[in-house]
Amino acid sequence: MKEKLLMGNEAIGLGALHAGVGFVFGYPGTPSTEILETVAKNKGEGVYVEWSVNEKAAIEAAAGAAYAGARSMVTMKQVGLNVASDPLMSLTYVGVKGGMVVVVADDPGPISSQTEQDTRHFAEFAKLPVFDPSSPEEAYQMIGDAFALSEQLGTPVLFRPTTRVCHGCVSLQMEDCSKRITPEGFIKDASRWVIFPRLTYQNHQKIEA
């Protein structure tokens, strides 16, 4: 165990690496930017990191990795979820195989954004679980739980740190190692991945249950 002084965004990035994330996609925007940067600086061999052209492209790329059984993460600020909402809503119905966490950093105030939005309303709208850490310590601990819950339920999970969580600094005790997860790979199966028309109705019943 090592003790490190970390910004909340750094804690999220390192927590994702320690949880075995294999693919990270994002679009920069305060207060979320340092999460992907931290992963890029600290990643080991076999971890893919990408600044995507926009949030929609980022979430679609992460979904592809999760379909193959890898743990994937997307990072963006709150207004970016507006751009990514189309694939997010479809993912609710399709589901995932590997853990997929969509980190959306909210900016109450707003302090550095054009609007104030609450991602928890998006989670309710999409019928997705949401983690809402209240401190950098909780963010580090919860990110691994978010991947585990995503795999347990077979659905993406939203993760909502706010500006003060993202940019607050704390001293954290953490493991100095990352979990290694080897994805099974994508298995072509029309009954599992072709959502329309039959699976749309079936999965709608599960979502609304």
Predicted regions and their residues:
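Thiamine diphosphate
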Residues: 1-136, 141, 162-165, 178-179
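Flexible, low-complexity linker and terminal segments
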Residues: 2-9, 133-209
